[in-house]
Swiss-Prot record:
UniProt GO molecular function: host cell surface receptor binding
Pfam families noted in UniProt: Hemagglutinin
Bilayer topology annotation: Single-pass type I membrane protein
Protein name per Swiss-Prot or TrEMBL: Hemagglutinin
Site (Cleavage): R344, G345
Topological region Cytoplasmic: 551-566
Family label: Belongs to the influenza viruses hemagglutinin family.
Encoding gene (name): HA
Species of provenance: Influenza A virus (strain A/USA:Albany/12/1951 H1N1)
Transmembrane segments: 530-550
Length: 566
């Protein structure tokens, strides 16, 4: 009995066998990503796909300065409000920047027809040629071209008028019928602007135009309207009881526009040959101009980013990331980051790919840790790591390329009478925005899930590669590790790692050691059987003695009577 117990203890106290483990990289990263099934998964490496920062400034777009309207709006600039005269020298721009509450628009009160459509047209214009469509000094010899000024459009405390229009009035007591035409020979679209004056009383009508009933006719291939003055008492705006309505049209190359009137015409003086650009636009912003350059401008500030998404502003100009409402879009490129608990020892549960990664393996994503008489160490599997890096890099680049459709997204303009249309447009835009956001988030969630599964598969494949080489020359110990049945020096370990392990070379030694271990197991089973029988017999004897003692005591004090009958 003692001999058998001694054999068991000797077997249990044998030296540790050589061991090799398959595992993966871990580090001190705190990056977290979301997947379809999990939230806030800590990973070793990830890339951010969402830009959330800007510089708060208006910048040059690809080296071209914007047109800053300052205190003027689009109407004041294009009509030539005297307070906006300095803007007329600008011939080209990357985009137009307008402040939210610009004060200089139409100086003489009135309506600007189709103003929102004009803004939309100008949002795609990157330069124009300003030219005299009807030269001031020789186009209107029978009409007065100097009296048409007003205190409403004053400049430097003097009455003035729009710099692109002429207010024609009577000359020498008459206002002859006029007819003036222009043929577009600019080989570009030409923007033509004019106006119609509506006096507040008949006396002003007679004084200015020498007739009570007047008309203005404007005709081109695509435009045909006849206007009559509406003479009526109105509340004063900017000191004026009268009104001017402003109109515009685009004249195609080769087309002809004809103006006929016998009064009340605010005639074109300058027109604009338009050049359109793909990257232009109009933004409304309080941001100030700075000495900076960018590829993407928003009302909040410039974005310098190659990321596919941004959550700064839906209105963008230039090559910009797609706007989404997300607050986080991070794509995993590494592995689950589960550093091993070092206090649990090098081998055991922490060494495998099941419960934790290795912070000590820094030169690859997947690899090995071995222990033998010559020592221990980590080694990355460079081939599987590089294949994984290439695959994930290509995937990330593909996702960014597919989603990184950079473009200009300008706001749409609606007048006060189009409120229902504006509300409907907002709902449609919100719907598209929700779809874009959902698609972006779902794409990232799915790709993160696939990447983490991809890493798990790679570790498993590496494990199976080692298992298929070792076969029964080693045993699995259930944590990503194998315990050799033979001595495996560093050369042997290296052969396992590079896939050249010589199974027959170690088969005989492994077989002998395996049989010894199996013998010890059988011997141990015999010892355990003897101990079990001994324990059962001893327990039964103790129970019988105890019952006998109790019976004897009860008989002696009369508590138990025993009768023996023959």
């Amino acid at each position: 009995m003692k001999a058998r117990l001694l054999i068991l203890l000797c077997a249990l106290s044998a030296t540790d066998a050589d061991t090799i483990c398959i595992g993966y990289h871990a580090n001190n990263s705190t990056d977290t990503v979301d997947t379809v099934l999990e939230k806030n998964v800590t990973v070793t490496h990830s890339v951010n796909l969402l830009e959330d920062s800007h510089n708060g400034k208006l910048c040059r777009l690809k080296g071209i300065a914007p047109l800053q309207l300052g205190k003027c709006n689009i109407a004041g600039w294009i009509l030539g409000n005297p307070e906006c005269e300095s803007l007329l020298s600008n011939r080209s721009w990357s985009y137009i920047a307008e402040t939210p509450n610009s004060e200089n628009g139409t100086c003489y009160p009135g309506d600007f027809a189709d103003y929102e459509e004009l803004r939309e047209q100008l949002s795609s214009v990157s330069s124009f040629e300003r030219f005299e469509i009807f030269p001031k000094e020789r186009s209107w010899p029978k009409h007065n071209i100097t009296r048409g000024v007003t205190a409403a459009c004053s400049h430097a405390k003097k009455s003035s008028f729009y710099k692109n229009l002429l207010w024609l009035t009577e000359a020498n007591g008459s206002y002859p019928n006029l007819s003036k035409s222009y043929v577009n020979n600019k080989e570009k679209e030409v923007l033509v602007l004019w106006g119609v004056h509506h006096p507040s009383n008949i006396e002003d009508q007679r004084t200015l135009y020498r007739k009570e009933n007047a008309y203005v006719s404007v005709v081109s291939s695509n435009y045909n309207r006849r206007f009559t003055p509406e003479i009526a008492e109105r509340p004063k705006v900017r000191g004026q009881a009268g009104r001017m309505n402003y109109y515009w049209t685009l004249l195609e190359p080769g087309d002809k526009i004809i103006f006929e009137a016998n009064g009340n015409l605010i005639a074109p003086w300058y027109a604009f040959a338009l050049s359109r650009g793909l990257g232009s636009g109009i933004i409304t912003s309080n941001a100030s101009m700075d000495e900076c350059d960018t590829k993407c401008q928003t009302p909040q500030g410039a974005i310098n980013s190659s990321l596919p998404f941004q959550n700064i502003h839906p209105v963008t100009i230039g090559e910009c990331p797609k706007y989404v409402r997300s607050t986080k879009l991070r794509m995993v490129t590494g592995l689950r980051n589960i550093p091993s608990i070092q206090s649990r020892g090098l081998f055991g549960a922490i060494a495998g790919f099941i419960e934790g990664g290795w912070t000590g393996m820094v030169d690859g994503w997947y690899g090995y840790h071995h222990q033998n008489e010559q020592g221990s160490g980590y080694a990355a599997d460079q081939k599987s790591t590089q294949n994984a890096i290439n695959g994930i890099t290509n995937k990330v680049n593909s996702v960014i390329e597919k989603m990184n459709t950079q473009f200009t997204a300008v706001g749409k303009e609606f007048n006060k009478l189009e409120k229902r249309m504006e509300n409907l447009n907002k709902k449609v835009d919100d719907g598209f925005l929700d779809i874009w956001t959902y698609n972006a988030e779902l794409l990232v969630l799915l790709e993160n899930e696939r990447t983490l599964d991809f890493h798990d598969s790679n570790v498993k494949n590496l494990y199976e590669k080692v298992k298929n080489q070792l076969r029964n020359n080693a045993k699995e110990i259930g944590n990503g590790c194998f315990e050799f049945y033979h001595k495996c020096d560093n050369e042997c370990m290296e052969s396992v790692k590079n896939g050249t392990y010589d199974y027959p070379k170690y088969s005989e030694e492994s077989k002998l050691n395996r049989e010894k271990i199996d013998g010890v197991k059988l011997e141990s089973m015999g010892v355990y059987q003897i101990l079990a029988i001994y324990s059962t017999v001893a327990s039964s004897l103790v129970l019988l003695v105890s019952l006998g003692a109790i019976s004897f005591w009860m008989c002696s004090n009369g508590s138990l009577q025993c009768r023996i009958c023959i």
